[in-house]
Amino acid sequence: MLPRLYRSVAVGLPRAIRAKSTPLRLCIQACSSSDSLKPQHPSLTFSDDNSRTRGWKVMGTLIGLGAVLAYHDHRCRASQESPRIYSKEDVRSHNNLKTGVWVTLGSEVFDVTKFVDLHPGGQSKLMLAAGGPLEPFWALYAVHNQPHVRELLAEYKIGELNPEDRMSPPLEASDPYSNDPMRHPALRINSQRPFNAEPPPELLTESYITPNPIFFTRNHLPVPNLDPDTYRLHVVGAPGGQSLSLSLDDLHKFPKHEVTVTLQCAGNRRSEMNKVKEVKGLEWRTGAISTARWAGARLCDVLAQAGHRLRETEAHVCFEGLDSDPTGTAYGASIPLARAMDPQAEVLLAYEMNGQPLPRDHGFPVRVVVPGVVGARHVKWLGRVSVESEESYSHWQRRDYKGFSPSVDWDTVDFDLAPSIQELPIQSAITQPQDGTTVESGEVIIKGYAWSGGGRAVIRVDVSMDGGLTWQEAELEGEEQHPRKAWAWRIWQLKAHVPAEQKELNIICKAVDDSYNVQPDTVAPIWNLRGVLSNAWHRVHVQVVP
């Protein structure tokens, strides 16, 4: 009787529960031998008189447990059959530990709040995706796209994304920015229209080469959508030479040249100048700088084919982009002809970025890359090149991107008196830890970047943990570069011991290049009304916890 009753209960339980429930499995083992009432464990001792009573108790327990587990399985199946539906706004509102941390993957919604502290890459990395999709971050870190990671994530599923939110909303045709490309959600946006954004510090120095999706973006106008098949680059010929109209295929016929170059916006770290006195410009933090491997035709080769040669008199190569405002005014800039014609300067008409065609935000199909020179001269969506006796008359060459004395204000400024920024000064910044965060005592890792314009190599980065009283030399990482052709940054790192009794750290970094240029210690003496050339010692204040 009892064995038959047990078997009927066990068969009635869901197969998955019978296999996975440890308590139930032990009960099954205790009652499924040929002598079903024979004790299977020393603690289970039945006398002949009460064995039947005890057996019924075991069966009662089994029946109750089976009912509970069967009901739980029913609820799980019902939940799977009818998942809760959440809107994109629901997910977006859960973007911190107080509200809960929700993310999406495909059509599924997950509450990963309890996993944040367990994330192998650290809490800060996972929080970058809080309130949004995981796909852009998994694209950066392919290690996530593994079956066991998806199985782990499945434990945190809470529902499905509303089907209406799985499609991008329609764009207004009259909006000049309606055709802008999609951007990576990790980017910190400083301006939506035109789009300007920087990668967060914790991602910026994760790798020597900045992944294309998180390369800082500096746009002045709407992003043009150019057809590579009909694209033409117009190069004005020299007197007696021949003007060129080059297709993308024509550019590919020139010898391909590759070079690793760091681009930095003139306004990088402008936010620190704004704390001293208000400036005009985007609130760039430390991320208006990135590094890529660029490939394309050398500008000197293209100019030579158009009949251009070095001149004894001053001359400038002027660039005009295909991005324009409603009046038809395009972005423009220029560099000295001497730099453009020097093969060692490695100026490119680039059509590849990190082995891929240029992304639209970064100048597709062709942009200028001028190693060692401020990002403002790296004209994107290049449409026209000419050689002139004077620099470009573009607003961004003549009336912007110039440095001034701290005494100059908007009532006294004269842009004609200041030269246009070309090469940038020595620069460094701390990317880990971030200002206002906490670190644990013991070994602390300090990370950052350093770079200098004009091909000058970074030879040293000094780091202080106590506000400048004492200094330690950081370890430099990155490619070895030729003298006077150090076009790319150095990533640096310092491992420092912090005693348990330490309460706070005032971390500072400063870099030195091979001309022994060093960063100024404070912002005030280099303040200027446009907030450019901000390269004072970078300072980070953190609390220490045991």
From Swiss-Prot:
Modification Phosphoserine, positions: S124
GO biological process terms, semicolon-separated: response to nutrient; sulfur compound metabolic process
GO function terms (MF aspect): heme binding; molybdenum ion binding; molybdopterin cofactor binding; sulfite oxidase activity
UniProt keyword terms in alphabetical order: Heme, Iron, Metal-binding, Mitochondrion, Molybdenum, Oxidoreductase, Phosphoprotein, Transit peptide
PROSITE patterns cross-referenced by the UniProt entry: CYTOCHROME_B5_1 (PS00191), CYTOCHROME_B5_2 (PS50255), MOLYBDOPTERIN_EUK (PS00559)
Compartment(s) of residence: Mitochondrion intermembrane space
Keyword match NADP: no
Cofactor(s) essential for the protein: heme b; Mo-molybdopterin
Binding residues for Mo-molybdopterin: F216, T217, R218, N219, H220, C265, D323, H362, R367, H378, V379, K380
Region (Homodimerization): 403-539
Binding site for heme b: H119, H144, Q146, H148
GO cellular component: mitochondrial intermembrane space; mitochondrion
Superkingdom to which the source organism belongs: Eukaryota
InterPro entries: Cyt_B5-like_heme/steroid-bd, Cyt_B5-like_heme/steroid_sf, Cyt_B5_heme-BS, Ig_E-set, MoCF_OxRdtse_dimer, Mopterin_OxRdtase_euk, OxRdtase_Mopterin-bd_dom, OxRdtase_Mopterin-bd_sf
Domain Cytochrome b5 heme-binding: 83-162
EC code(s) of this entry: 1.8.3.1
Region spans: Hinge: 166-175
Pathway: Energy metabolism; sulfur metabolism
Residue stretch of the organelle transit peptide: 1-80
Subunit note: Homodimer.
Protein name as annotated: Sulfite oxidase, mitochondrial
Gene designation per UniProt: Suox
